[in-house]
């Protein structure tokens, strides 16, 4: 395989156990062919024999530090074993220090970064600056960039520009981006140089520069407003995963002044950006769904953005929530659910065994399938019970819609679109219960259908078919006592399933106080913040 022509993503996939893939990634990073945004994907911490290679090759140390910066310092992937990595870096530090003292230019830059971030040693900014300077003065673009960034943070912009320019001349595109940022920080901003350097970086694929250009053309900063240019740069940046640009692209689509106006495309862009946590995209969606009377989606984005004040306009706390008046009965319901659930499952499985291994008539296999279908229904009921007892976001009575028309609107939207809403209020036994999360709403829709008798027929019909099948068996079998025994088992099973369903309905009614408590105590869920006051 010619690794020099392999796509970077493929190299990343191969690198864990492939030395040649590792070498190619390292070389590409050293010459700046790997975009900064991909560093977090490389994750060399899993590479075979990585730390042994770091002892002898400063390039591997550089890659390790780049990954450390992208993953650990940005807190991208907490699953990576930080403690082990830090131990290894502490062991590597004296090796890097010795290599730097031996005038290895890349090691000097590596050591500067380790001092700057406190990697394998204490943070020592002055030493970091010293080693960066030694490396930068020998022409290493990474060190020149790091030194430029050091002066940028110190607000020494003239010195910062000097080092960013040197780094940019070596082809390091991030230096062009930082040059642009620095020109705008000057006491008299140099807009022309800023835009020039944004363009240089953007044309090399720097998505942050592409985003900045999109904003400049969209807002008409330093140049005339140009929606087509804004669209171009936002789209290029968004394709690389920049969710700020995704929001910007949405704004272009949403603008009535733009030839690209497309409301649905705008909403799709806002959703992508909002799902990455962009607060303004979330607010745009709240505004859009409120105007269009899609109350459930509006509340979803209110929850995502912690907009409790907006939620309070639609959902209220029910202050006078009674605690269950019969704790003993509630405990009995819970115990009976467990006992009856185990019993009906046992009876159903007993019928399966009977028809698989005892009865040998022509339709025994048909009865097995009926029993297995019934078994799946019983298991579903048991799973429902577990959800009712452990999910704190469904069938709550502590909250309700301020205006019943909100729930009517949600039901109408579900009926016309077929889409499950994020929040919905159901009525059961003349009481109102509210549920959050689409999966939960779908579940509650199903269970409420059973309480209304809509889906009750599924298990009931299976039992009737079983009874009929056994009655036909009596005409051909001599073992009538065994048949009667199975028929009694079926009758008992029917009675017990009815009892289990009734107990499950009691769980909805009497278990609500437990669900309310779990909901209010769940401080990680933004809706629970309604109770903060």
Curated annotation (Swiss-Prot):
Upper taxonomic classification of the species? Viruses, Varidnaviria, Bamfordvirae, Nucleocytoviricota, Megaviricetes
Species in which this protein is naturally found: Acanthamoeba polyphaga mimivirus
* Start-end of each Sel1-like repeat: 105-140, 141-172, 173-206, 207-242, 243-278
Q: Which UniProt keywords apply?
A: Repeat
Q: According to its UniProt record, what is one Pfam family this protein matches? A: Sel1
What's the protein here called?
Putative sel1-like repeat-containing protein L21
For this protein, the record's InterPro entries field holds: Sel1-like, Sel1_AlgK, TPR-like_helical_dom_sf
Does the keyword field hold Repeat? yes
């Amino acid at each position: 395989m010619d690794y020099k022509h392999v796509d970077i993503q493929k190299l990343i996939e191969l690198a864990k156990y492939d030395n040649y893939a590792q070498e190619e990634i390292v070389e590409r990073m050293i010459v700046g062919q790997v975009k900064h945004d991909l560093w977090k994907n490389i994750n060399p911490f899993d590479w075979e024999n990585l730390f042994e290679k770091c002892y002898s090759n400063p390039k591997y140390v550089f890659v390790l530090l780049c990954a450390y910066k992208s993953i650990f310092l940005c807190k991208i992937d907490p699953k990576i074993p930080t403690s082990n990595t830090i131990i290894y870096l502490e062991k590597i530090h004296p090796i890097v220090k010795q290599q730097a003292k031996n005038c290895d230019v890349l090691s000097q830059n590596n050591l500067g970064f380790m001092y700057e971030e406190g990697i394998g040693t204490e943070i020592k900014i002055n030493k970091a600056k010293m080693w960066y300077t030694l490396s930068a003065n020998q022409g290493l673009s990474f060190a020149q960039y790091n030194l430029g960034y050091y002066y940028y943070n110190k607000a020494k912009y003239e010195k910062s520009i000097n080092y960013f320019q040197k780094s940019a001349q070596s082809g390091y595109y991030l230096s062009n981006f930082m040059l642009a940022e620095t020109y705008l920080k000057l006491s008299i901003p140099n807009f022309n140089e800023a835009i020039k350097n944004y363009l240089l970086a953007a044309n090399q694929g720097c998505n942050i520069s592409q985003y900045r250009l999109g904003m400049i053309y969209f807002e008409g900063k330093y140049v005339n407003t140009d929606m087509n240019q804004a669209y171009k740069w936002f789209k290029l940046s968004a394709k690389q995963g920049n969710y700020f640009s995704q929001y910007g692209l949405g704004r272009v689509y949403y603008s009535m002044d733009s030839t690209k106006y497309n409301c649905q495309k705008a909403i799709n862009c806002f959703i992508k950006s909002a799902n990455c946590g962009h607060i303004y995209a979330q607010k745009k969606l709240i505004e859009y769904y409120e105007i269009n009377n899609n109350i459930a989606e509006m509340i979803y984005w209110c929850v995502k953005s912690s907009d409790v004040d907006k939620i309070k306009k639609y959902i209220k706390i029910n202050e006078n929530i009674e605690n269950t008046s019969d704790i003993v009965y509630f405990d009995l319901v819970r115990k009976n659910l467990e006992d009856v659930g185990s019993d009906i499952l046992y009876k159903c499985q007993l019928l399966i065994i009977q028809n698989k291994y005892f009865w040998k008539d022509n339709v025994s296999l048909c009865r097995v399938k009926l029993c297995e279908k019934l078994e799946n229904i019983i298991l579903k009921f048991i799973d429902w019970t577990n959800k009712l007892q452990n999910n704190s976001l469904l069938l709550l009575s502590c909250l309700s819609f301020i205006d019943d028309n909100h729930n009517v609107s949600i039901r109408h939207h579900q009926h016309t679109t077929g889409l499950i809403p994020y929040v919905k209020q159901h009525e059961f036994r003349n009481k109102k219960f509210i549920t959050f999360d689409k999966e939960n709403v779908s579940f509650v829709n199903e269970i409420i259908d059973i309480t209304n008798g809509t889906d009750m027929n599924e298990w009931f019909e299976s039992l009737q078919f079983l009874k009929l099948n056994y009655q036909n068996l009596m005409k051909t079998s001599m073992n009538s006592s065994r048949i009667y025994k199975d028929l009694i088992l079926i009758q008992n099973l029917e009675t017990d399933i009815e009892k289990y369903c009734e107990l499950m309905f009691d769980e909805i009614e009497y278990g609500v106080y437990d669900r309310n408590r779990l909901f209010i105590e769940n401080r990680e869920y933004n809706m629970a913040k309604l109770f903060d006051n």
